[in-house]
Amino acid sequence: MDENVILSVSGLSKHYKYYKTLFDIKKNVIKALDGVSFEVFKNEIFAVVGETGCGKSTLSKLILGLTEKTSGEIYFKGEPLDYGNKKKDFRKKIQILFQDPYSSLNPKKKIYKMISYPAVKNGIIKNKKKDRIDFAAEQLENVGLSESTAFSYPHMLSGGQRQRVGIARCLSVRPELLILDEPVSALDVSISAQILNLLTDLRNKNGMSYIFITHDLKLVRHLADRVCVMYGGKIMEIAETDDFFNAPAHPYSKTLMESMESISFTRPNL
């Protein structure tokens, strides 16, 4: 396997079986994900786009080990992705930034406790109050927040500040792959631009890879290195970003392009 590949997905499927009625003898099958294969390279922003229900969220859950796959394989840096293997400690290496900064933080805990907790659990720092506060303050500084934020509760922060806290919490265990699940859809435009700039800077600084899950092609155009288009649980097309926007190969990709109200084909400063 190419050493430049951080994540490899091969023939990944997730099927759900159900009965339509109480009198059905045979179960029906919903193919939420059906034979998906792709690779994510080191230090790459790999965008996964598609309409609601195309399988984007199911894909992220499978990568994170939050649901069992029906078939297929997932490899992280050439090794089978097995979250039960404590020696490999994959949970520390793969993190997710959730869509909603309002519900992803515990309203009853101070910020420093939430940021430092993963580091304590993974043996990065000791479970001492001073160590936890100092560690959280350092992480907050890395995402553009003041040290005093460490003693705040989530309700005391704006949406943009909460999302920055979410980023700091993800980075506290020094991940190599970060899944961004619609990271700015709950934020206004100006704050979204700040968060996206921050994520880009952190990628360049830390050498991480991103799987950027979104339905917004404008953001994909400005941020992603490659684009993966999904529909009905399958991959329709994978292409370099510029190639995708200049000449989409699949009819569904062209439909997505046409559905955009407007798009700038230059890369403005966000």
Go through the PLM ranges and name each one.
Residues 153-157, 161:
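Conserved ABC ATPase signature
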